[in-house]
Amino acid sequence: MDENALSYAAFYAVTVSLVGCLLFQSNWNIWLCANFLGYCFAAGVMLAYRSDIYCSLGCYIALMSTFHYMEFLTTALTNPANLSVDSYLLNHSVPYGLAALASWVEYAIEFWVNSDIKGLRWFGASGIGVIVCLVGDLIRKTAMFHAGKSFNHIVQGTKAKEHQLITNGLYSYVRHPSYLGWFLFSIGTQMVLCNPLCLFAYIVVTWRFFAERIYVEEYILLQFFGDQYSKYQKSVPRTGVPFVKGFKNNL
């Protein structure tokens, strides 16, 4: 792609974003996030397709932008009442941002030391990582569709009228398929980037995060559904995240 083409593409991107902000003033932040993720996806695909040396980075960018955009779109389709700009999960938390930053720093340093180790190899760790990301994201989005209005990005302390216990579909195999999907996706991203240090760190940190979250969430679900959820725990003993047991009511 020559410089003129890049200039036209940049001009088009800025123009579309500005026009969108004017037309959708009340939802300008949602529009900008959608544009940002769309441009990131396009840039990622271009890198993956046109550059052997940056192929893994391009795949990573495309996968990340797809993950966050589909979080918003899936919420819009299944639970529009809870839809907001936060549904993109771009501003998930400070630790989430720092984890992403750490992976970019490791990639940059290792690429500078030896760029050959960062090339995408479809039968190597990076290629397997792409598959892990796709499978993980598919599991998560499928779980969101199965849960419908009962799914929320934030653990709810109060039971809503439409809140139901979902036990069919993926929930008949594991109790928290959405967390399983996200766990796999997060690990897969570091395999794509060939980041050995962050791969280990992501496994430890995300496992601990989901272990704590599942424990709290299941405590609340037992308050919401009582014996119904206790029986569900017994019929579906796996949480989805390896070695995470969740909260058990021993009374």
State each model region's role.
Residues 154-182:
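Active-site-proximal inter-transmembrane loops
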Residues 1-161, 188-251:
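Membrane-anchoring alpha-helices and their flanking helix-loop junctions
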